[in-house]
């Protein structure tokens, strides 16, 4: 098996020596699981990395702690930014920030508020909203000529039903500022709309949109000063909405090597258009799009962050690079010096245990190791005795196996 950090060491971008040192505020440097790797990326590029989150420092993963030069716990960081940001300013004192980074969806707007309060360059609050509010997002893209699903915004049960009549069936109901496929429902008639409404009482605003029947892909980028420096095409098998509603499925995310294939050409072109229309400047983006049976390509949604569920690891395995450090170079210096050679298809297969309770045995793993050998990049399964996770509330379920092949 391949150690993603060791594998990428010789490809890690050298820290820039001809520019002044950078000081970066990293929001949630230890969570989700990939964040310590992004924190490390900033550090190896020569930045002084300061961390802030709502949890105590001792709970941070060791990798994150090792690459931080300071950490502030702000319990109200996400619940009351108006109170938390002045506390952050007092803690910083005379220190000046060059960048504010957050690669976790719930913190994208927060990061923009901190930038504006402290006068730090980067994505503004208005720009961030176009990546968080699906209505604003689709309005901007439709005006720019991008094919988006027909949709309507709803805040009450009555508005949801009215929107359903306007959009037509089948349709999707999902949070206006959600992430992934959580709290997302397909409805084929008014009765199913009522069932969805009963489960969405904790969501203030929803998007009711046309259901696009097709295969689902991603278009992910690292941008620097408005330039797309790196892009990635991913493929979900099956589409997440199906995987989220069928427990027996082992969901797969495929990193597709043949980025010039006609199968994905229109989606790639759409992705480039979306970045241009939204005026994205610097950082990671994660876009989802659909290809219908008749070949039509339809936009899904886009986020100003990397994909989750270890997909950046997939990108690294596919090209033997370190995109955690590559992203950091773009963020800090506006450059991207990694050489990208698309060597492999790579896939992450998520596993769900059978039954309830604790993991009692793992079947078939030895056969997989014997059969696939060097094609296995990583195996991360819950150890025996561990309680099974709630498969509906986690993307990685009870663990995963990552493979690659030319």
Protein language model regions, located:
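Short amphipathic alpha-helical segments and helix-helix/interface helices
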Residues: 36-43, 138, 161, 197, ...
């Amino acid at each position: 098996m391949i150690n993603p950090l060791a594998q990428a060491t010789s490809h890690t971008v050298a820290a820039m020596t001809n520019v002044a040192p950078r000081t970066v505020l990293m929001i949630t440097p230890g969570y989700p699981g990939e964040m310590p790797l992004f924190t490390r990326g900033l550090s190896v590029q020569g930045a002084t990395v300061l961390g802030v989150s709502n949890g105590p420092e001792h709970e941070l993963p060791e990798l994150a702690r090792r690459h931080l030069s300071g950490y502030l716990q702000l319990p109200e960081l996400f619940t009351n930014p108006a109170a938390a940001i002045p506390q952050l300013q007092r803690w910083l004192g005379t220190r000046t920030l060059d960048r504010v980074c957050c690669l976790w969806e719930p913190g994208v707007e927060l990061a923009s508020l901190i930038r504006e309060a402290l006068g730090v360059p980067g994505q503004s609050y208005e720009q961030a909203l176009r990546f968080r509010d699906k209505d604003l997002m689709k309005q901007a893209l439709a005006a720019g000529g991008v094919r988006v699903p027909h949709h309507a915004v709803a805040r009450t049960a009555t508005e949801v039903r009215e929107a359903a009549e306007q959009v037509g069936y089948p349709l999707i109901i999902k949070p206006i500022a959600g992430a992934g496929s959580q709290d997302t429902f397909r409805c084929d008639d008014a009765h199913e709309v009522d069932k969805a409404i009963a489960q969405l009482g904790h969501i203030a605003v929803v998007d009711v949109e046309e259901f696009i029947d097709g295969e689902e892909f991603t278009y992910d980028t690292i941008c620097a000063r408005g330039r797309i420096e790196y892009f990635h095409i991913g493929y979900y098998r099956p589409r997440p909405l199906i995987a989220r509603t069928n427990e027996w499925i082992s969901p797969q995310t495929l990193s597709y090597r043949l980025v010039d294939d006609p199968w994905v050409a229109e989606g790639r072109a759409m992705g480039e258009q979306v970045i241009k229309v939204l005026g994205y400047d610097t950082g990671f983006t994660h876009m989802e799009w659909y290809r219908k049976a008749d070949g039509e390509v339809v936009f899904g949604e886009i986020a100003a962050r990397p994909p989750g569920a270890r997909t950046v690891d997939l990108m690294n395995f596919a090209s033997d690079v370190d995109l955690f450090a590559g992203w950091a170079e773009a963020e800090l210096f506006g450059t991207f010096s990694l050489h990208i050679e698309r060597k492999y298809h790579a896939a992450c297969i998520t596993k769900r245990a059978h039954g309830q309770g604790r993991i009692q045995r793992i079947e078939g793993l030895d056969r997989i190791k014997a059969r696939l050998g060097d094609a296995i990049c990583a195996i991360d399964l819950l150890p025996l005795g561990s309680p099974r996770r709630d498969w509906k509330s986690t993307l990685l379920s009870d663990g995963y196996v990552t493979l690659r092949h030319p």
